[in-house]
Amino acid sequence: MPLIRGNLSKIGLLLFACGLFLTIVGIVVIHSALSASPSKYEQDYYLRQMIWMMAALAAFIVVVFMPMRLFEVFAYVVFAVVVLMLVGLFFKGGGKAARWYSFGLFNLQVSEIAKLAVIFVLARYLTYSRRPANSVLRFGVVISLVAIPMLLVLRQPDLGTSLVFLAIFITVLFWSGLPGPYMLLIISPVISLIASSHPASWVVFFVLLLVLLQFLKPGTVFSITTSVINLLSGIIMPFVWNRLQDYQKMRILVFLDPGRDPLGAGYQIIQSKIAVGSGGLWGKGYMAGTQTNLAFIPERHTDFVFSVIGEEFGFWGGILVLIAFAAIVLLGIRVAYKCRNMFSSYVVVGGISVIAFQVVVNVGMALGLMPVTGLPLPFVSYGGSSLIMSWVILGLIVNAELNWQEY
């Protein structure tokens, strides 16, 4: 099958161009971010990222020309293998889950593969499920398929990545035509947990929820179920808070008030905001960022790589990067909408949700609008597993676009 095929190839080529642009930006920024590092090993990170780019492009080409039917047939097998690999990390870590398997110079981060596995298994199940969108059993199966890997990743502990599964879950269910009241059931317990930090705010939220349920009239059973779940969510908040790791609690508290620990947990957010703000409209210039070169920004090649972009290339540089991401998301939605094969459509939507969620969270961290969760910026942040998975997702979207007429 030729890569260029009339008008259908234009979207694929544009998606490829956006991905390549972001990856090159990542390599350039990683080089700048670590150029002043006293470690020669860190200075060469950009060279390793170039090697990962070659591997990622190879994976992209393979995925583009691989029959989508193959992913559909082996969806459950891939999911089972990934779950076993996640469980195996607990034995590897001696009771405490590690986050990757080491193969010489290469570390395999299983949670990255788990994102794809969840997308495939949800797409497979929803494509062949004959139950109505509002079926309780169908809803329960989908929750189980997402909850298993999500809880295993959360146990590592990796809160940021576990939230990606939630984004996939909500987006794919919405695309499957889940009625509004059911979406309310998914989202409202999270709001209830947040609101329960202050008793008065939780009472107001719960009353508003009851009024909304009365207005929507989803049925007695659903209304009672939603009310009970939200009631329990509010009650168990102290238990959930106590189960969080100390650094996770501090990240949340510092997100609300960075000045609480300016030299500790709040240091990252404060320095990141200084870097982005000091970049102005046009930036300080390549390799001229003071916050970057003086290493005031921690994890500047991974979690806070957007801060380096903001400082060195300014507001317009950051906007250009965000436009590239927006193009990928919008073109992906267009592909998902026109796909005749529902499996392909679900896969594209799931992939888009991963990229969009990680961009929002990562950029939000750099701007101090989100708590620090450790999620990388797709295509840009340093890391082989993340880069390859980003390109695999892009390959799946292009694959679906090339074969959108197939059932």
Over which residues does each language-model region extend?
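Hydrophobic alpha-helical transmembrane segments
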Residues: I51-A56, K115, E312-G332
